[in-house]
């Protein structure tokens, strides 16, 4: 059962995961407006970076409207209460990028790896701790390994110095039982002082439910975003999550009405593609595909005259993971070739 006396650490990701929804094009003005609203509403941290983390701006992932440091500096100069967080994927961002983000005002960092590759986070976690940052391990695509194996990876991150480790449902393939099993496995091996967190997506409409189940199984921190602004069908919608836990009489420290207003008045008008469950975003969850593949897959489908749904299902069959965005075009070309051969045989 959830401890009603325990304060939930509310981690907003509108200005990082939400970058995916608008192709990393937040203006500084929009970033400041969102950060100010979140800060006033009482969230604990506000994550800021390119959608793929520090140094993610690239041909492979898409170029940002601004640099990570420009966004971080703007938000850090705005907030009065919330901590500024950022994300780093080893192999994309470096310790030099992390130092620059720290100097720009970031005080929380989430070091993200694939769920079976925690060992590549050692250098970055140790460096973050040396800076005095609140250091979090972030195990992406957590559905792709067993609860026990995931817990071993979490234990590695803890051994490097991570103060919190997350179950990250990047592929949106976890149901409530899956979430419960992973947090129970974490609890069995992690030091009681090490916190745990949940990063949910909403492609199967389970973002809020999975986050609440995580809390029921000892989770300390929950990620969410205004309107669910994020990759795929988005993250757990922050305003919905807070409304739900408020009705449960759980401690969250946020103003529900302010979050609802910020979601509707500031964030929703920025969406060039509605962040919702639809044919394409549902396909991501159904196939267990990395949520940030959405916009890349839609572009490939339009270019080659294919179904985005079919491409995503094939990506799922091939067990593609984050960082393999370049393979989306390869898969599309394979499917195009197969269709042409089928047409020739039919003729």
From Swiss-Prot:
InterPro entries: 2-IPM_HCS-like, 4OH_2_O-val_aldolase, Aldolase_TIM, DmpG_comm, DRE_TIM_HOA, PYR_CT. The record marks 16 as: Transition state stabilizer. The keyword Lyase applies. Mn(2+) binds at residues 17, 199, 201. SUPFAM superfamilies: Aldolase (SSF51569), post-HMGL domain-like (SSF89000). GO terms for molecular function: 2-isopropylmalate synthase activity; 4-hydroxy-2-oxovalerate aldolase activity; manganese ion binding. The keyword Oxidoreductase does not apply. Residues 8-260 form the Pyruvate carboxyltransferase domain. GO terms for biological process: catabolic process; L-leucine biosynthetic process. It catalyses: (S)-4-hydroxy-2-oxopentanoate = acetaldehyde + pyruvate. Substrate binds at residues 16-17, 170, 199, 290. Keywords: Aromatic hydrocarbons catabolism, Lyase, Manganese, Metal-binding. It is an enzyme of class 4 (lyase). The active site is at 20 (proton acceptor). Its EC number is 4.1.3.39. Belongs to the 4-hydroxy-2-oxovalerate aldolase family. HAMAP family: HOA (MF_01656). This is 4-hydroxy-2-oxovalerate aldolase. It comes from Paraburkholderia phytofirmans (strain DSM 17436 / LMG 22146 / PsJN) (Burkholderia phytofirmans).
């Amino acid at each position: 059962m959830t401890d009603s006396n325990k304060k939930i650490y509310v981690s907003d990701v509108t200005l990082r995961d939400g970058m995916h929804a608008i192709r990393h094009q937040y203006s500084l003005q929009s970033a400041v407006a969102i950060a100010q609203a979140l800060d006033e509403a009482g969230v604990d941290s506000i994550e800021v970076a390119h959608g793929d983390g520090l140094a993610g701006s690239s041909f492979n992932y898409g170029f940002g409207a601004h640099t990570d440091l420009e966004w971080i500096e703007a938000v850090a100069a705005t907030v009065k209460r919330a901590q500024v967080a950022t994300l780093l994927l080893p192999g994309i961002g470096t310790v030099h990028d992390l130092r620059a983000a720290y100097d720009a005002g970031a005080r929380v960092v989430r070091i993200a790896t694939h769920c079976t590759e925690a060992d590549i986070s050692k250098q970055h976690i140790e460096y973050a701790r040396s800076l005095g940052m609140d250091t979090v391990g972030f195990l992406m695509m957590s559905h792709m390994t067993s609860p026990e194996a995931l817990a071993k990876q979490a234990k590695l991150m803890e051994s490097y110095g991570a103060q919190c480790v997350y179950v990250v449902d990047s592929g949106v393939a976890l149901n409530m039982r899956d979430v419960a099993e992973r947090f129970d496995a974490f609890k069995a091996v992690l030091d009681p002082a090490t916190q745990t967190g949940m990063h949910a997506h909403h492609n199967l409409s389970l973002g809020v439910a999975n986050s609440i189940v995580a809390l029921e199984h000892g989770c300390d921190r929950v990620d969410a975003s205004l309107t669910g602004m994020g990759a795929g069908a988005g993250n757990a919608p922050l305003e919905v999550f807070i409304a739900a836990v408020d009705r449960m009489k759980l401690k969250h420290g946020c103003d529900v009405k302010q979050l609802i207003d910020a979601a509707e008045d500031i964030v929703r008008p920025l969406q060039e593609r509605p962040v919702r469950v639809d044919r394409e975003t549902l396909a991501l969850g159904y196939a267990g595909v990395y949520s940030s593949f959405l916009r890349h897959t839609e572009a490939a489908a339009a270019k080659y005259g294919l179904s985005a749904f079919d491409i995503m299902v094939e990506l799922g069959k091939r067990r593609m993971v984050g960082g393999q965005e370049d393979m989306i075009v390869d898969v599309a070309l394979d499917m195009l070739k197969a269709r042409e051969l089928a047409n020739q045989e039919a003729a």
